[in-house]
A protein has these predicted regions:
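Ubiquitin-like/PB1-type beta-grasp interaction modules and other compact soluble beta-rich domains
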Residues: 1-83
């Protein structure tokens, strides 16, 4: 199992602060996050592209969507910040 923590708009849009999941890569988490968001809010409009634009950290270092995961890893997905 890996621990997934969400920050920024992604946390607000999904209603998910943290969850645990089985996944082979960061990208494998996408459908799980979308499914969990819809379970918490059936009207959720979160989609793959919302997650795809996130900053990825795995165990405190920058990761990629293709980063392989192993049991005990911690993944952080954070929406990029913008504004002026």
């Amino acid at each position: 199992m890996v621990t997934v923590r969400l920050f920024g708009l992604l946390r607000l849009d999904t209603g998910i602060k943290e969850l645990t999941a089985d996944a082979g890569s960061v990208r494998d988490l996408y459908p799980l996050l979308i499914q969990e968001a819809k379970k918490r809010d059936p009207g959720s409009k979160v989609k793959k592209s919302d997650i795809d634009g996130c900053i990825v950290m795995v165990n405190g270092t920058q990761g990629k969507k293709s980063t392989k995961l192993k049991d005990g890893d911690t993944v952080i997905l954070m929406s990029p910040v913008s504004g002026g």
